[in-house]
UniProtKB/Swiss-Prot annotation:
Compartments, as annotated in UniProt: Cell membrane
Family under the similarity heading: Belongs to the PrsA family.
Record bears the keyword Plastid: no
Superkingdom assignment: Bacteria
Full protein name: Foldase protein PrsA 2
Function (record text): Plays a major role in protein secretion by helping the post-translocational extracellular folding of several secreted proteins.
Lipidated residues (N-palmitoyl cysteine): 21
Keywords for this protein: Cell membrane, Isomerase, Lipoprotein, Membrane, Palmitate, Rotamase, Signal
GO cellular component: plasma membrane
Start and end residues of each PpiC domain: 134-224
Reaction catalysed by this enzyme: [protein]-peptidylproline (omega=180) = [protein]-peptidylproline (omega=0)
Lipidation (S-diacylglycerol cysteine): 21
Length: 285
């Protein structure tokens, strides 16, 4: 779901527009106090100044993506029903918590999310798949947050310390530390790019220097490398791994959305909002 405040302001503007039906006068009052008056024009201007660019970005993004990447209504409804079943009687409360007006508003968000997933799928080329055509490997790692600590661990390993024991003592990866850092077998496109690049460069038994990723600093040990399977046998699983990796990467989604909006040749007629697509970035998915 996208930024909660956008939905709240969308609802406010909808309410304002409804209440203003039949009132053409911009000096009509929205609220008054003993010595204060808030006019309709002033209220609308404040909303536009504060939230107009965010709203325009979101509305245009949804329109461009959902029209280019069609998602069947049955698929959207299926996802909506899945969430409704998950939350049961709390579903309406969940909508309120996210600032969504009603189920239809939620459905539009699901449709946008699924359309973005479709855009991500279409972004994967045959070259991307072939670039990730590599043998399945098995690795262990020790993850820490500080680079100097990672360097110290590497020095201990170079001096003969047990990788498995150091992983149990020092690694911050709770899922693998009790297994001596063992990550099991994985294919290309499964791990963080920086991690994978380093792991695939190692020979079996070799230990890497500290590798930085968004999770911290890794010291990686390659423990096995399988024989490379025929391309036709693994290409579908490689593509699926790439889809999952890109879908889970907010940076990739943001970049892809910006590229799609650029290709849409958007023209803004309102001078107050003219720089929306150069200054405003998406709030997230």
């Amino acid at each position: 779901m996208r930024g909660k405040h956008i939905f709240i302001i969308t609802a406010l503007i909808s309410i304002l527009m409804l209440s203003a039906c039949g009132q053409k006068n911009g000096s009509a009052t929205v609220a008054t106090a003993t010595d204060s008056t808030i006019t309709k024009d002033n209220f609308e201007k404040q909303l536009k100044d504060r939230y107009g660019k965010d709203m325009l970005y979101e509305m245009m993004a949804q329109d461009v993506i959902t029209k280019k990447y069609k998602v069947p209504d049955e698929e959207v409804n299926k996802e909506v029903e899945k969430v409704k079943k998950q939350y049961g009687d709390q579903f309406k409360k969940v909508l309120e918590n996210y600032g969504l007006k009603d189920e239809e508003d939620f459905k539009n968000q699901i449709k946008f999310k699924l359309a973005m997933n479709e855009a991500i799928k279409k972004s994967i080329t045959e070259k991307d798949v072939k670039d990730h055509y590599k043998p399945e490997i098995k690795a262990s790692h020790i993850l820490v947050s500080d680079e100097n600590e990672a360097k110290e661990i590497k020095s201990k390993l170079d001096a003969g310390a047990s990788f498995e024991e150091l992983a149990k003592q020092e690694s911050q990866d709770l899922l693998s530390k009790d297994k001596g850092g063992d990550l099991g077998y994985f294919n290309s496109g499964t791990m963080a790019p920086e991690f994978e690049t380093a792991a695939y460069k190692l020979n079996v038994g070799q230990i890497s220097n500290p590798v930085k990723s968004s999770n911290g600093y890794h010291v990686i040990k390659l423990t096995d490398k399988k024989a490379l399977k025929p391309y036709d046998e693994v290409k579908d699983s490689i593509r699926k791994n790439l889809e999952e990796e890109r879908t889970a990467d907010p940076v990739f989604s943001k970049k892809l959305l910006q590229e799609e909006l650029k290709k849409a040749n958007i023209k803004i007629n309102d001078s107050d909002l003219k720089d929306t697509f150069t200054l405003v970035s998406p709030q997230g998915n």
